[in-house]
């Protein structure tokens, strides 16, 4: 890759720019994004091999691996899913409200208890 870039830069007839462009070249930026995916792929492979050796640690390691990949996916899906369910949600609360009414009598009972001590005192 570097060999290909050097000739292209040399054509510009600006050796100074060639050096600067090398520093500014997005090669560094491209490497950063590519590095995370690459390590992620080998990481699971290595872990999968180690668990076979350590049966006990196999349980925790695999458990953590699946969770990690899921976490990034869940957050992305969560915002999308809630939006769709949010519309059906309003109708859902309505049927749920009736059960809430029986709960309302409970709060009054609590105030009754304090009311009794008041006169008693």
Swiss-Prot record:
Chain coiled-coil ranges: none
Alphabetical keyword list: Biomineralization, Extracellular matrix, Repeat, Secreted
UniProt GO MF annotations: structural constituent of tooth enamel
Stretches with biased composition (Low complexity): 60-84
Signal peptide annotation: none
Known role: Plays a role in the biomineralization of teeth. Seems to regulate the formation of crystallites during the secretory stage of tooth enamel development. Thought to play a major role in the structural organization and mineralization of developing enamel.
Protein name: Amelogenin
Species whose genome carries this gene: Tachyglossus aculeatus aculeatus
Gene name per UniProt: AMEL
């Amino acid at each position: 890759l570097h060999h290909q870039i050097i000739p292209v830069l040399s054509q510009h007839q600006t050796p100074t720019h060639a050096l600067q462009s090398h520093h500014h070249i997005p090669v560094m930026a491209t490497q950063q994004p590519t590095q995370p995916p690459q390590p992620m792929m080998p990481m699971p492979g290595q872990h999968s091999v180690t668990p076979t050796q350590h049966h006990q640690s196999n349980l925790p390691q695999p458990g953590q691996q699946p969770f990690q990949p899921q976490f990034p996916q869940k957050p992305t899906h969560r915002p999308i899913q809630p939006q769709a369910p949010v519309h059906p949600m309003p109708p859902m609360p309505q049927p749920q409200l009736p059960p809430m009414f029986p709960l309302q009598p409970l709060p009054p009972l609590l105030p009754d208890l304090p009311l009794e001590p008041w006169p008693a005192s």
